[in-house]
């Protein structure tokens, strides 16, 4: 029986095949916004996340324009948009809507396995592409990372364990994302940030913490580990006061 990640990647293969049948990439170049620059100070990458395999529906009918505008007003350094439809109920339309509303860097959060998905994200307005080590062979990861650079975009290369981290370090990527969620089981363990963060601090690489960040205490914990930013979805999508969450992120260590 396959893992959740296996099921997602199988679905992505079908979507990629459909894209090759129905989508022609645009040739025009455009200006992009830099996450690396935003991470010069501690940054919240605030996510638009309608649903997930682990939580089910989170905020299914969110007004993307309103949510993104609130994030930017509260001081988000970047916005992440889930574009997966089958498991997270997002879309490239959500990404495009966020681009129309936002002037800060925009991350396409999806399970990218092929260049044509990067083309589609670029057209929808993405500045940053998520590349998940667990979903790719070493060769495919290298190929897609090179293509991200070719498009003038930045990448977050996502890892969960030591083995994936060593693969990511070889790329010397713009940003490494430590995902506290195991994509095979979808269980969350914030100590992954502390374990892997030590190695990244030694390498002097730029990195962020992803998943399982819900409170001021969590923010303090990942800041102490050396993270330059956090990617937060569920906590913001269910928050009664997004402003308060952002205020908590300003705590000094």
From Swiss-Prot:
Pfam families: IGPS (PF00218)
Keyword Lyase carried by entry: yes
Catalytic activity: 1-(2-carboxyphenylamino)-1-deoxy-D-ribulose 5-phosphate + H(+) = (1S,2R)-1-C-(indol-3-yl)glycerol 3-phosphate + CO2 + H2O
A GO BP annotation: L-tryptophan biosynthetic process
Domain of life: Bacteria
Molecular functions (GO terms): indole-3-glycerol-phosphate synthase activity; phosphoribosylanthranilate isomerase activity
Pathway(s) served: Amino-acid biosynthesis; L-tryptophan biosynthesis; L-tryptophan from chorismate: step 4/5
EC number: 4.1.1.48
Keywords in alphabetical order: Amino-acid biosynthesis, Aromatic amino acid biosynthesis, Decarboxylase, Lyase, Tryptophan biosynthesis
Disulfide bonds, paired cysteine numbers: none
UniProt cross-references to HAMAP family, sorted A to Z: IGPS_B (MF_00134_B)
Protein family (similarity comment): Belongs to the TrpC family.
Name the record gives this protein: Indole-3-glycerol phosphate synthase
Gene: trpC
């Amino acid at each position: 029986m396959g893992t959740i990640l296996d099921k997602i990647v199988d679905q992505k293969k079908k979507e990629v095949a459909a894209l090759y049948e129905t989508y022609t990439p645009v040739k025009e170049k455009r200006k992009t916004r830099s996450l690396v620059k935003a991470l010069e100070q501690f940054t919240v990458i605030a996510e638009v996340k309608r649903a997930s395999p682990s939580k089910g529906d989170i905020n299914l009918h969110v007004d993307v324009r309103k949510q993104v505008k609130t994030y930017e007003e509260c001081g988000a350094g970047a916005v992440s948009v889930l574009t997966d439809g089958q498991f997270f109920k997002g879309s490239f339309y959500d990404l495009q809507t966020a681009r129309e509303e936002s002037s800060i860097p925009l991350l396409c959060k999806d399970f990218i396995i092929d260049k044509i998905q990067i083309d589609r994200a670029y057209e929808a307005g993405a500045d940053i592409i998520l590349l998940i080590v667990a979903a790719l062979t070493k060769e495919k990861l290298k190929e897609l990372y090179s293509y991200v650079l070719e498009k003038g975009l930045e990448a977050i290369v996502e890892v969960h364990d030591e083995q994936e981290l060593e693969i990511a370090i070889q790329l010397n990527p713009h940003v490494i994302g430590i995902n506290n969620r195991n994509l095979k089981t979808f269980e969350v363990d914030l100590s992954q940030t502390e374990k892997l963060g030590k190695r990244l601090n030694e390498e002097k690489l730029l990195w962020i913490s992803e998943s399982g960040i819900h409170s001021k205490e969590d923010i303090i914990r990942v800041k102490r580990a050396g993270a330059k930013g956090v990617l937060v979805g569920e906590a913001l999508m269910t928050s009664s006061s997004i402003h308060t969450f952002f205020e908590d992120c300003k705590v000094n260590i």
